[in-house]
Design a protein with these regions (language model features):
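The feature captures the conserved acid-bearing segment of alpha/beta-hydrolase catalytic domains
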Residues: 110-163
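Hydrophobic anchor at the start of a short beta-strand
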Residues: 36-39, 77, 96, 128, ...
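C-terminal alpha-helix
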Residues: 164-172
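Short, surface-exposed "cap/lid" segments of acyl-processing enzymes
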Residues: 1-48
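Short coil/turn segments at beta-strand junctions that form active-site/ligand-binding loops
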Residues: 3-4, 74-76, 101, 126
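Alpha/beta-hydrolase active-site loop
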Residues: 42, 48-77
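Structural motif
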Residues: 9-17, 42-45, 80-85, 108-112, ...
Length: 172
């Protein structure tokens, strides 16, 4: 399934970022292989101070799903998630399925992989790729390998380096 849109997801509120979404989008737009593909990142508002972590995660997924619906994104989409937001890839994928928007793949950058308990029989519904810089938790990268996902080791977390891998995956 070919990709029409690359969606660079912001970090979960309150968690460290694996990449700067704006810089990564810029790097992807500069790569000639992404010509003809729409590339974007959406903003997620800060949570209320009294929101518990479960509510923060639910609002993050909901805001992204609404943002994708209202921005006129064409599927199939390649979802890029980093850090703690990687654990939310199942929920974000299901939100796209509910919107009847196909997902061409998931790219987890130095990310937390979804727990085995959160995986349902119909997820992943598209190929999952793990991009591991030296900053990646080796246990998370190993979990990706054990699940049969492709792991792409990169020498650094520079947006151009990560963007090069993502651009190649978007055109595969």
């Amino acid at each position: 399934m070919s990709t029409a849109t690359i969606v660079v997801c912001p970090p979960l509120p309150g968690s460290p970022a694996s990449y700067d979404p704006t810089d990564l989008v810029d790097a992807l737009l500069d790569d000639p292989r992404t010509g003809g593909l729409r590339t974007l990142s959406l903003d997620v508002p800060d949570p209320d101070a009294d929101d518990d972590p479960r509510t923060v995660r639910a609002h993050w997924v909901a805001h992204l799903a609404i943002g994708l619906a209202t921005s006129g994104v064409k599927g199939p989409v390649l979802l890029v998630l980093g850090g703690a937001s990687g654990a939310m890839s199942t929920a974000l994928g299901f939100s796209q399925k509910a919107a009847r928007r196909a997902v061409s793949g998931y790219v987890l950058v130095d990310a937390v992989v979804p727990s085995a308990d959160s995986r349902i029989d119909d997820w992943p519904d598209a190929p999952v790729h793990y991009v591991a810089s030296p900053a990646a938790d080796p246990l998370e990268a190993n979990q990706a390998r054990l699940r049969g996902w492709s792991v792409h080791e990169v020498p650094d977390a520079d947006p151009t380096t990560i963007g090069t891998v993502i651009a190649g995956l978007a055109r595969d």
